[in-house]
């Protein structure tokens, strides 16, 4: 189930593939931090983007983490949640549409300066990440992002010390 299920896309009324996000985290002592990046409009978000044809959904999310945040690590093979956001489409007239994003948890092992400039990747504790993600967003969208941070924090705190290899992908082959 690495690709977004077509039946779910139809059920949600989505005519095009959804976006995928890498919810990047690192352990910082007994706490956890999340890696956020800036959008072109200055909002904070998780590294995200469209599905890439040659990659699975989780690999596409990991590729976004690399391109936007310079992060490499181990990403889970299945989404742990979904959230809503908006996407601006520029053309003859500017339109804003709602999109559903599949969220993949990624344990970051290393981070360097990203390929994309202007992203300003930064680490935040869960409460600060929620505050930053909520800035300049309607409450409907900030609430879904807050739930993703809460779900990720809960999942990380309950994770066994040994990963599930069949459910995770190493990013070594995407270098």
What do these predicted regions represent?
Residues 35-38:
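Short, acidic/hydrophobic/Gly-rich beta-strand patch recurrent on exposed beta strands
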Residues 45-49:
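A short gly/proline-enriched turn/hairpin at secondary-structure junctions
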Residues 51-141, 173-175:
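Unchanged
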Residues 136-175:
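Charged phosphate-binding loop/patch that engages nucleotide di/tri-phosphates or the phosphate backbone
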Residues 1-29:
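Acidic, metal-coordinating catalytic segment for phosphate/diphosphate chemistry
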Residues 28-33, 92-96:
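Short, solvent-exposed loop/turn segments that connect beta-strands within catalytic domains
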């Amino acid at each position: 189930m690495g690709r977004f299920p077509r039946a779910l896309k139809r059920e949600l009324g989505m005519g095009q593939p959804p976006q995928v996000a890498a919810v990047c985290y690192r352990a910082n002592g007994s706490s956890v931090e999340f890696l956020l990046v800036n959008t072109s409009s200055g909002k904070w978000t998780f590294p995200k983007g469209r599905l890439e044809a040659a990659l699975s959904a989780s690999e596409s999310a990991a590729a976004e983490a690399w391109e936007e945040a310079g992060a490499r690590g181990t990403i889970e093979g299945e989404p742990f949640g979904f959230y809503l956001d908006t996407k601006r489409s520029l053309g003859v007239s500017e339109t804003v549409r709602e999109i559903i994003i599949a969220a993949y948890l990624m344990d970051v092992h290393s981070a360097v300066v990203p390929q994309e400039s202007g992203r300003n990747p930064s680490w935040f504790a869960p409460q600060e990440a929620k505050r930053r993600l909520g800035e300049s967003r309607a409450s409907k969208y900030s609430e879904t992002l807050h739930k993703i941070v809460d779900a990720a924090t809960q999942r990380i705190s309950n994770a066994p010390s040994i990963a599930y290899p069949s459910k995770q992908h190493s990013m070594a082959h995407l270098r």
